[in-house]
């Protein structure tokens, strides 16, 4: 079973790794993730259809979003009962966000040869009577019931197409009502950052298990793909997990982690099938694809672990099926929040090839 993030359309300063010599640009080394002061928010006076999550009762008012947020580097496209927000900068970088699921389905960047390439891998499947989009980047949490997860709703957008576009989404947990969840998606010239923020508004401590921000990176083939900068990092082999609608659902009979060890290679080839949690890894490392002559710097804040999955060579080379899954997680150690405390975790995808 492969790790899969998916959503349903019809329902509503990074230190360098110890041995890596790849330099990060100064803009990536210190990314301000607080929301701009000139943010435009959806006020309470807005009709329910404009601010409610996508559902048959309250469909998103796309025309309102277009009127309210024009000039902020964002456009909106209606796709049934949900909406795609397209973030774009003047340099050509762009990202597509599925609003109700908080899922990034596309991240395109300008590279050394002057063209643009897609960094994320997504695909569409028909499941029963519904269309399902898999892959991309999305957050997930361990739970027993996908119905406990509510849709993300747009809170506001700030910035402009020249320097940075930021979008804030919010969501509530139907099971743990004391938790306030925020997701801030920031598109800069060469970096896409996804920040997940959780606030304990209750009076008792809480624990969140199985949190992750995993990205599906498109590659030419796993044989040509390498993770650079992980030498000396401790890891634990584990079975792939399956996030459904933002819920991490593990294989119950195989949930316990297996063999552990230390990464021996600083140039780890991802040609073999693997599902691994790195428990002691640098805050940033690089994924190189020799086939596409491309690379991505994967960075994190807040999270202590890095999850990595490769389907190995069983996938046909140089097709739309080739991908690797990489991102920060807390699959082994839950996130503990005292009353009134805030936790934040960030995934950075940086393009060093422009």
From Swiss-Prot:
User: Keywords assigned by UniProt?
Assistant: Chaperone, Chloroplast, Membrane, Plastid, Thylakoid, Transit peptide
Domain of life of the source: Eukaryota
Predominant subcellular localization, coarse grouping: plastid
Q: Where is the transit peptide?
A: 1-49
Q: Please report any disulfide bonds recorded for this protein chain, giving both cysteine positions.
A: none
One cellular component (GO) term of this entry: chloroplast thylakoid membrane
Q: Which Gene3D superfamilies match?
A: 2.70.98.10
Q: Which residues cross the membrane?
A: none
Q: Carries keyword Chaperone?
A: yes
Q: Which GO terms describe its biological process?
A: carbohydrate metabolic process; photosynthetic electron transport in photosystem I; positive regulation of gene expression
The GO terms this record gives for MF are: carbohydrate binding; catalytic activity
Q: Does the keyword Hydrolase apply?
A: no
Q: Which InterPro entries match?
A: Gal_mutarotase_sf_dom, GH-type_carb-bd
- Cell compartments where the protein resides: Plastid, Chloroplast thylakoid membrane
Phenotype caused by lack of the gene: Impaired chloroplastic NAD(P)H dehydrogenase (NDH) activity, probably due to a reduced stability of the NDH complex.
Q: What does this protein do?
A: Required for both formation and activity of the chloroplast NAD(P)H dehydrogenase (NDH) complex of the photosynthetic electron transport chain. May function in assembly or stabilization of the NDH complex.
This protein's name: Protein NDH-DEPENDENT CYCLIC ELECTRON FLOW 5
Q: Gene that codes for this?
A: NDF5
């Amino acid at each position: 079973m492969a790790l899969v993030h998916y959503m349903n359309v019809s329902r509503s300063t990074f230190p360098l790794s110890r041995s890596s010599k790849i330099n990060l640009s100064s803009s990536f080394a210190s990314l301000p993730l607080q929301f701009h002061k000139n943010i435009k928010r959806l006020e309470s006076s807005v009709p329910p259809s404009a601010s409610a999550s996508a559902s048959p009762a309250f469909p998103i008012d796309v025309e309102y979003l277009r009127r309210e947020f024009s000039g902020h580097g964002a456009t909106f496209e209606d796709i049934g009962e949900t909406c795609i927000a397209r973030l774009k900068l003047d340099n050509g970088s762009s990202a597509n966000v599925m609003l109700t699921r908080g899922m990034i389905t596309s991240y395109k960047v300008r590279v050394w040869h002057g063209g643009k390439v897609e960094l994320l891998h997504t695909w569409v499947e028909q499941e029963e009577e519904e269309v399902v989009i898999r892959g991309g980047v999305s957050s997930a949490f361990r739970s027993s019931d996908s119905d406990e997860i509510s849709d993300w709703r747009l809170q506001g957008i700030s910035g402009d197409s020249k320097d940075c576009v930021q979008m804030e989404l919010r969501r509530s947990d139907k099971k743990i009502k004391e938790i306030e969840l925020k997701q801030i998606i920031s598109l800069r010239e060469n970096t896409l950052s996804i920040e997940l923020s959780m606030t304990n508004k209750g009076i008792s401590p809480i624990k969140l298990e199985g949190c992750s921000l995993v990205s599906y990176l498109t590659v030419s083939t796993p044989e040509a793909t390498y993770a650079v900068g992980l030498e000396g990092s401790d890891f634990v082999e584990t079975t792939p997990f399956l996030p459904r609608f933002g819920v991490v659902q593990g294989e119950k009979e195989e949930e316990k982690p297996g063999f552990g060890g230390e990464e021996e290679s600083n140039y780890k080839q991802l040609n073999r099938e693997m599902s691994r949690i790195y428990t002691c890894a640098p805050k940033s490392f690089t994924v190189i694809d020799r086939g596409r002559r491309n690379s991505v710097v994967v960075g994190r804040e807040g999270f202590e672990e890095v999850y990595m999955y490769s389907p190995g060579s069983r996938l046909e080379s140089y097709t739309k099926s080739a991908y690797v899954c990489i991102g920060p997680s807390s699959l082994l150690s839950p996130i503990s929040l005292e009353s009134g405390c805030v936790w934040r975790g960030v995934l950075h995808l940086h393009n060093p090839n422009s």
